[in-house]
């Protein structure tokens, strides 16, 4: 897809379907990589997408460097149904996401008339000046559609399958709400959690065997320290098929009963 022109965002709500819809998140910013700013967006986006039937498959964090951003945009947009980016659309010299996305798509960067109008209207209310820095925030790649929000006058944008959002969590969340009705969504991933009441090492082999016989189900084990300060495990079973989910859950519960009975005799 590198260097090709893509259509702008759809203008009507997308219907749900039974196919798998995937996404990646690209976090842009030196401040994240340096540790100065702690990311608060990845987990929110993951929960949001899961709830509407989109599988988040990959997350990358890149610095404010054009080659890194362009390469990541092209790699991720070609691999997944959607790419969501956060950060780098502010008024300063190091906010270069718009330029980089335009370069990735091989199109010009231009001031969007609606973005300029929104910015001027907000500044008229606040008494601010429409200066060069604020004009930077009205630039989008040619052909992009604005991603509006109720919090900030500065919009994000959507071009092809790339949705560019702010890094500020409250603004990002408002932008995500704005685009959600237009996203293609798939069948939701169902999930069940089972408390094992034994250590992960006690069930690892048996759990692996169950995973092999239930190949259409994702099975994960997550150790934790319980309220008695003992090593414990949560087993999480995930599938789009409720019957397959139930079958795997029953098999795991039966295995746990056997294992715990054996441990009690030891």
At which residue positions do the language-model features occur?
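Conserved short beta-strand edge segments in small beta-sheet-based binding/regulatory domains
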Residues: 255-266
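N-terminal amphipathic/basic leader segments beginning at the initiator methionine
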Residues: 1-22
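Glycine-rich beta-strand-to-loop/alpha-helix junction loops that act as flexible
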Residues: 28-30, 85-93, 167, 222, ...
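Short beta->alpha linker loops
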Residues: 61-64, 114, 135, 198
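Proline/glycine-rich low-complexity loops and linkers
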Residues: 68-74, 95-186
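An accessory alpha-helical subdomain
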Residues: 161-255
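Glycine-rich phosphate/diphosphate-binding loop of Rossmann-like nucleotide-binding domains
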Residues: 17-59, 63-64, 243-250
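N-terminal small/polar loop signature for handling phosphorylated ligands or for N-terminal nucleophile
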Residues: 43-96, 103, 124
């Amino acid at each position: 897809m590198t260097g090709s022109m893509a259509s702008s965002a759809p203008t009507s709500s997308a219907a749900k379907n039974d196919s798998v819809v995937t996404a990646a998140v690209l976090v842009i910013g030196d401040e994240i990589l340096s540790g100065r700013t702690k990311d608060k967006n990845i987990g929110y986006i993951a929960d949001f997408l899961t709830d509407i039937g989109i599988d988040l498959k990959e997350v990358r964090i890149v610095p404010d460097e054009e080659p890194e951003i362009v390469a990541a945009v092209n790699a991720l947009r070609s691999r997944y149904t959607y790419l969501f980016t956060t950060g780098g659309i502010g008024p300063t010299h190091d906010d270069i996401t718009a330029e980089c996305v335009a370069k990735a798509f091989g199109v010009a960067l231009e001031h969007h008339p609606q973005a300029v109008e929104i910015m001027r209207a907000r500044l008229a209310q606040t008494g601010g000046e429409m200066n060069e820095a604020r004009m930077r925030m009205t630039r989008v790649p040619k052909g992009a559609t604005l991603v509006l929000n109720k919090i900030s006058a500065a919009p994000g944008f959507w071009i092809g399958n790339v949705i560019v959002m702010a890094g500020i969590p409250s603004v990002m969340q408002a932008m995500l709400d704005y685009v959600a009705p237009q996203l293609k969504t798939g069948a939701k991933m169902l999930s069940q959690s089972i408390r094992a009441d034994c250590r992960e090492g006690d069930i690892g082999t048996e759990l692996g065997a169950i995973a092999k016989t239930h190949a259409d189900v994702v099975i994960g084990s997550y150790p934790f320290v319980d309220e008695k300060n003992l090593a414990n495990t949560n087993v999480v079973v995930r599938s789009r098929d409720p019957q397959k989910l139930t079958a795997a859950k029953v098999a795991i519960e039966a295995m746990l009963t056997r294992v715990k009975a054996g441990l009690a005799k030891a």
